[in-house]
Amino acid sequence: MHISTGMVRASISNTLVTLTIEGNNDRYQVILDKNVNAKQFVKTCWRNKKPLIVKEGKIFVDKGFPFDPCRTFLEALYEKYSYSSPLPSSVEFKSGKQVEFCGFEKIQSKQRDLKSLRVIILDNYRIEDIEIEYEYSKILPEVIDLDLSRNLFHEFFPILKLCSQLPSLRNLTLDSNLFSNFISSNTVLLIPHLTQLSVNGCGLNSKDVQWITETFPSLEVLYLEANEIILSKATSFKNLQFLQTLSLANNLNLYSADGYAVDVFQGINNLNLSSTSLADVAELPVHTLHKLTFLDISENNIRDIRSLDHLRTLENLKHLRITLSYFNKPTDIAKLLVIARIPSLVKLNDVNISPNERLDAELYYTSCIRKLVIDNEIKDVEELTKIEPFWEEIWKSHELPSIQFHLEASINDWTSGILKNRITKGIKISSINSGATMLLKLHYNWKLLDIKALISYHFAIPVHTSTFVFASSERDVSFSPKTVRDDQKRLFELPFTCTFIDVYAKESGNV
């Protein structure tokens, strides 16, 4: 095996690895797939007397290393599907019971007849090349599904020639083949009969994707996961008029370009964008995704839950996958808010949404809106709508009473009111001693001692040298806490609705 600067696939002890070389180095560095245990791999190789070199946590092999022998496509095909050894007709257990096999010979005889094969799976058969000089239309006329994953292909053109000779072929899987020369010929071949293509983890870039869309114009399902694709103005799938399912998961720099085609996902039903550096749902061209029913945007850095409002326009969206823990909220709370914001959802993270769960989610959302109004002192509908554009839809669907917005008041225009059905209320405060008057907002659950401390702070007077009279103009009553027990009363425990608080100096004797 010989490679120049770059990467290529090889097989060592029946384990698929990637080899890299830089410059004129006499060694290849061995890179293992994520699912391979490095320690176990090294032990197995040494046990089989494979001369691996381990240095500083990296694995190397010399150029003359005894790699596993490669096969051609036909060699692998005949090895698996034309195996001629007889099957046992029965098996006898230790107990003496004998079990006869029925029908297996018939199955094997059909496998031996390659012309009747409809599904071919040659996963990890160390296939390096395809003999393009044969007429595969006569050898494999009925093949519908072809899986050549985890082999040693480094050029795509022989596979393309094979597909062009299989008229019944509909599904092609080429996962984990590292194509160092994806477009290897100037010859243009169209494969109009292929409807599903999977090229996950094949080292493809944006130019390769554009070539795929032109070569396979009838694709309905396309998997491009774990490649090196970057969406740009030159990247588009609009040539694939029949495309329904597209997966670009684990393309870590997918959204790193400054701009990308707005019609890149036009007409797609199922879209997977997990782990693609998507930081804001607003980056999705939702106006071109009106047919979308499934969307996976999990494992992306989406932290603003309000950005999900962009998905409300997708009326056909039924299933959403998203990482709830990224919203800096408890997972159960984040789940309720996501459900409430997207009314079309029937499934979230592969779990069905029940009618009761949707009701709970929307009612919880309304409580969050009320809290938002109070905490931010929102004054009117327009101000709230700028923050939460769709709050009124949920309000009307549940026929909820109108929100009581924050009302600003000054000393001049303040009028007395009653503390009722409100969390906070403006109370007029006057200090007889200093001749000052002001308006404070008090919480109905505050203790009188806390209120006295707050008022004393504003008027710069000691708490224990003044008398505080809580009065009501409507009932003509007053209440002056004199004992510790009264001091611990809360505002709603007073025998009347408080509208005034007067502060007197104790030495005046006026209570």
UniProtKB/Swiss-Prot annotation:
Source organism per entry reads Schizosaccharomyces pombe (strain 972 / ATCC 24843)
Q: Which GO terms describe its biological process?
A: microtubule cytoskeleton organization; post-chaperonin tubulin folding pathway; tubulin complex assembly
Q: Where in this chain does the entry annotate a coiled-coil region?
A: none
The compartments listed are: Cytoplasm, Cytoskeleton
Question: What function does this protein fulfil?
Answer: Required for microtubule and spindle assembly. Involved in the proper folding of alpha-tubulin.
Please provide the record's keywords in A-Z order.
Answer: Chaperone, Cytoplasm, Cytoskeleton, Leucine-rich repeat, Microtubule, Repeat
**One Gene Ontology cellular component annotation held by this UniProt entry:** cytosol
Kindly list the GO molecular function terms attached to this UniProt entry.
Answer: alpha-tubulin binding; unfolded protein binding
Location (main, coarse): cytoplasm
Q: Oligomeric state and partners?
A: Interacts with alp1 and alp11.
- For whether the record's keyword set contains Chaperone, the answer is yes
User: Which residue ranges contain the repeat LRR?
Assistant: 116-137, 142-163, 168-190, 191-217, 218-241, 242-264, 267-288, 291-312
What name does this protein carry?
Answer: Cell polarity protein alp21
List each copy of the LRRCT domain by range.
325-364
**Matching InterPro entries:** Leu-rich_rpt (IPR001611), LRR_dom_sf (IPR032675)
Q: Does the keyword Transferase apply?
A: no
* Lineage of producing organism: Eukaryota, Fungi, Dikarya, Ascomycota, Taphrinomycotina
